[in-house]
């Protein structure tokens, strides 16, 4: 089960401080992650972001200079979804971080797409790998990972999908599919089978079953 605990002002969390990251900004779960060795990324933990990690373009520019990731592909589509809503449509880059650390937990081969939200986002898929505790009164973020290290290497599709009004639509088109499909096209079949009706919130929390 995906678990987030919110602590009260009266009672501090019992989770070890070794699993704690302080909020960079009081009142919001904005924390500092490490990309590779010595590259800080300030990011917002945002359960409205359906991916594991979404990279703000200004952070992309800074980390590119530091060689913190590899560029995998270029695409065009809708911006990322988060607490601030959906970002403007724009060109997006898909990158891969060889190493991204959330406190003491190491994530290898982390794929991210660039977007234009106010912050780089650490999304809801973090909860696949551990429990999160948010202590707003003390400005603390705790992550209790199930394992000390994860390899997130995975296959990549040439289009990205999202749910709109119960239907699957194409939200991003990557390099090899440009000119074949367009952003906003409706998906009617996956692997030859007609698609069903989808719940937007369920798709963010658990993904789209047919694509797993």
For each predicted feature, which ranges?
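Pepsin/retropepsin-fold aspartyl endopeptidases
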Residues: 1-212
